[in-house]
Swiss-Prot record:
Enzyme Commission code: 2.6.1.9
Cofactors required: pyridoxal 5'-phosphate
Modified residues (N6-(pyridoxal phosphate)lysine): 232
Pathway: Amino-acid biosynthesis; L-histidine biosynthesis; L-histidine from 5-phospho-alpha-D-ribose 1-diphosphate: step 7/9
Summary of subunit composition and partner proteins: Homodimer.
Keywords carried by this UniProt record: Amino-acid biosynthesis, Aminotransferase, Histidine biosynthesis, Pyridoxal phosphate, Transferase
GO BP field: L-histidine biosynthetic process
Top enzyme category: transferase
GO molecular function: histidinol-phosphate transaminase activity; pyridoxal phosphate binding
Reaction catalysed by this enzyme: L-histidinol phosphate + 2-oxoglutarate = 3-(imidazol-4-yl)-2-oxopropyl phosphate + L-glutamate
PROSITE patterns found in the cross-reference section: AA_TRANSFER_CLASS_2 (PS00599)
This protein's name: Histidinol-phosphate aminotransferase
Length: 377
């Protein structure tokens, strides 16, 4: 028996604007091939595991003390990493870190959104953006992407000018479609904003062929914040570490809304260890890009429509019934993601043998009624 199980959510004094909402979450199922959450499939090296073990062990000796509430050493390491990756000279004052990029985004909306303010996104895109807007009582606006799921910059500029949102979400590479946004397009969006902040979500930035938007922060210090994560290319999803890059004044704003001691000493120690092994870990990015291209070409040859991707996942279709097709993949031991786009599914790029399993299942499905829009019999 579970204590209190006689009541339901309807019995609680829940905020009216949260009633009828659904929680975020990808299915967590034990299947042979899991390609639904865009993790790096390559496990950490033994050297990294040993470093994390040692570093966390040292931090554990001080567990009776609160952690560094501002995570200064970690933020300094993140600045050093980005200096090398982007060529932009950053300091600890330009970095903020939290428990995953979703907490970063939540803190941004706590500081710059809220009642009476609005945020706009260009959909389909990352589904947590409107959820975080709802949670912070920020009015959520949205505009459609182009038919190929790319960002229609002309439309975006018009929407920004007409609706004057306080926050603009741009995801590059976009999740779930995978396209990156060139710097010249970002400039157009930023120039269209009289006020407000553009949040550039670069969760998959290490995979992108485009330069990071970090290069534009000095030109647009009041308008641009870049959000990033160690959960994807960095193979640190279990560590839960996200961060943002911005002008120092934005970091001051984060101090106003963060919870005390929000990053544990163990998280800080493990993340710093992961950063020390960045070169080894990120060597897998080239392998994943090559696998992405192989899978995309193979799916195209089977007759699927594949959306060109600049990330570690692929959006593909078209299916007569995407939810039923998702289930058919699952029946074959392959878990991918139904992202709610009619006719399309998204697959993470995994290890070569996992990708082969996806392609084998796809070859079977292309001959079924679920792929009727492809002309299959």
């Amino acid at each position: 028996m579970t204590v209190g199980e006689r009541i339901t959510l309807a019995d609680l004094p829940l905020r009216d604007d949260l009633r009828g909402k659904s929680p975020y979450g990808a299915p967590q199922l034990q299947v042979p091939v899991r390609l639904n959450t865009n993790e790096n499939p390559h496990p950490p090296s033994q050297a990294l595991v040993d470093d994390v073990t040692r570093s966390v062990g040292e931090a554990a000796a001080e567990l009776h003390r609160y952690p560094d509430r501002d995570a200064v050493a970690l933020r300094s390491d993140l600045a050093d990493y980005l200096n090398l990756r982007t060529g932009v000279e950053l300091s600890v004052e330009n970095l903020w870190a939290a428990n995953g990029s979703n907490e970063v985004l939540q803190q941004l909306l706590q500081a710059f959104g809220g009642p009476g303010r609005s945020a706009i996104g260009f959909v389909p895109s990352y589904s947590m953006h409107p959820i975080i807007a709802d949670a912070t009582r920020t009015e959520w606006l949205q505009a459609l992407r182009a038919d190929d799921f790319g960002l229609d910059v002309d439309t975006a500029v018009r929407e920004i000018a007409a609706r004057r949102p306080d926050l603009v979400f741009v995801t590059s590479p976009n999740n779930p479609s995978g396209q990156s946004v060139p710097l010249e397009d970002l400039r157009r969006l930023l120039d269209a904003m009289e006020t407000g902040i553009l949040i550039l979500d670069e969760a998959y930035g290490e995979f992108s062929s485009q330069p990071s938007g970090v290069a534009l922060i000095d030109q647009y210090p009041t308008k641009l914040v870049v959000s990033r994560t160690m959960s994807k290319a960095f193979a640190f999803a279990g560590g839960r570490l996200g961060y943002l890059v911005a002008a120092p004044a934005v970091i001051e704003a984060m101090l106003l809304v963060r919870l005390p001691y929000h990053l544990s000493s163990l998280t800080q120690a493990a993340a710093r260890a992961a950063l020390r092994h960045a070169d080894d870990t990120l060597a897998s990015v080239a392998t994943l890009i090559a696998e992405r291209d192989r899978v995309a070409n193979s799916l195209s040859q089977l007759g699927f429509r594949v959306v060109p991707s600049d990330a570690n996942f692929i959006l593909f279709g078209e299916f007569a019934d995407a939810p039923a097709t998702w289930r058919r993949y699952l029946d074959q031991g392959v878990l991918i993601r139904d992202v709610g786009i009619p006719g399309y599914l998204r697959t993470t790029i995994g290890l070569a043998e996992e990708n082969d399993a996806l392609l084998t299942a796809s070859a079977r499905l292309v001959e079924t009624e679920l792929a009727a829009t492809l002309g299959a019999s």
